[in-house]
Amino acid sequence: MEKLAASTVTDLACVTAINSSPPPLSPISEQSFNNKHQEEFAASFASLYNSIFSPESLSPSPPSSSSPPSRVDTTTEHRLLQAKLILEYDELNEHYELCLNRLQSLMTELDSLRHENDSLRFENSDLLKLIRISTSSSSSVSPPAPIHNRQFRHQISDSRSAKRNNQERNSLPKSISVRSQGYLKINHGFEASDLQTSQLSSNSVSSSQKVCVVQTKGEREALELEVYRQGMMKTELCNKWQETGACCYGDNCQFAHGIDELRPVIRHPRYKTEVCRMMVTGAMCPYGHRCHFRHSLTDQERMMMMMLTR
């Protein structure tokens, strides 16, 4: 510091001497004097600049008032965390808007489906009314079941339990088949007639026929039944009633709701006497319970099938 002060005083003296008015000179030496004066001024200014701004002071040094590195790192992490949270918030906001738009579209679709369901319900009710009207008109023409048929149905119903649960409904037969020689007569008369004759005599062909059924051993008298052709009303059990115990058509249904309503069907004399070839080959019969051949196998037939497969 003492050296700096001394140099400063010296420099100030030089500056004072330089700034002082020079003595009057001759015109010849005035130019050389000015050059010398400028050189001295530059040298004194350089020494003054070096004394004030030393090279050591120009070297970079960390400021004394700067914050510690740990504090700077904490601030940076905090800012990065805030930026990350802002990005996550933007993503959640976009996802929320997408979900809201999807919900609105689903609500619109639900409303359209509800209106469509209402219109279909009205159309279904109209169709049910038409079906009831048509079935009521057709049922009014069909004759009531005779007394001897009722007696036969009561004999079948008495052999079963009075409670009609699901197991009992599933065990009921789909139809009551009566093998008779009259089946051949009916088919022969129907095939021999032409189309016009069949249209005129459709009532006589499709009407019922009385046949005698030979009872089991121990019963001497044969039972006279009134049988119907396959496909007529109440000749087959209602699938809906057999599954759930109820039918949406009620009394207007063309199928039987129980063994009491089931009408006997006249069949070929050899109906269900031979085994279905589809069952022998191990395939499923497409006709199901309507097949005219037997689907149940005896022990002897099972043994023969096992021998054939070997």
From Swiss-Prot:
<feature type="compositionally biased region" description="Basic and acidic residues">
    <location>
        <begin position="155"/>
        <end position="167"/>
    </location>
</feature>
<dbReference type="GO" id="GO:0003677">
    <property type="term" value="F:DNA binding"/>
</dbReference>
<keyword id="KW-0863">Zinc-finger</keyword>
<keyword id="KW-0238">DNA-binding</keyword>
<dbReference type="InterPro" id="IPR036855">
    <property type="entry name" value="Znf_CCCH_sf"/>
</dbReference>
<dbReference type="Pfam" id="PF00642">
    <property type="entry name" value="zf-CCCH"/>
</dbReference>
<dbReference type="InterPro" id="IPR000571">
    <property type="entry name" value="Znf_CCCH"/>
</dbReference>
<feature type="coiled-coil region">
    <location>
        <begin position="84"/>
        <end position="129"/>
    </location>
</feature>
<feature type="zinc finger region" description="C3H1-type 1">
    <location>
        <begin position="232"/>
        <end position="260"/>
    </location>
</feature>
<feature type="region of interest" description="Disordered">
    <location>
        <begin position="56"/>
        <end position="75"/>
    </location>
</feature>
<dbReference type="InterPro" id="IPR045877">
    <property type="entry name" value="ZFP36-like"/>
</dbReference>
<dbReference type="GO" id="GO:1901347">
    <property type="term" value="P:negative regulation of secondary cell wall biogenesis"/>
</dbReference>
<comment type="function">
    <text>Functions probably as a transcriptional factor that activates genes involved in secondary cell wall biosynthesis. May play a role in both transcriptional and post-transcriptional regulation. Binds to ssDNA, dsDNA, and ribohomopolymers in vitro. Maybe involved in post-transcriptional regulation of its target genes. Targets RNA of a polygalacturonase, a well-known cell wall modifying gene. Functions redudantly with C3H15 to regulate secondary cell wall formation. C3H14 and C3H15 have overlapping roles in the regulation of secondary cell wall formation and anther development.</text>
</comment>
<keyword id="KW-0805">Transcription regulation</keyword>
<feature type="region of interest" description="Disordered">
    <location>
        <begin position="155"/>
        <end position="174"/>
    </location>
</feature>
<dbReference type="GO" id="GO:0045893">
    <property type="term" value="P:positive regulation of DNA-templated transcription"/>
</dbReference>
<keyword id="KW-0677">Repeat</keyword>
<keyword id="KW-0862">Zinc</keyword>
<dbReference type="GO" id="GO:0003729">
    <property type="term" value="F:mRNA binding"/>
</dbReference>
<dbReference type="GO" id="GO:0008270">
    <property type="term" value="F:zinc ion binding"/>
</dbReference>
<keyword id="KW-0175">Coiled coil</keyword>
<protein>
    <recommendedName>
        <fullName>Zinc finger CCCH domain-containing protein 14</fullName>
    </recommendedName>
</protein>
<keyword id="KW-0479">Metal-binding</keyword>
<dbReference type="GO" id="GO:0051511">
    <property type="term" value="P:negative regulation of unidimensional cell growth"/>
</dbReference>
<keyword id="KW-0804">Transcription</keyword>
<feature type="zinc finger region" description="C3H1-type 2">
    <location>
        <begin position="270"/>
        <end position="298"/>
    </location>
</feature>
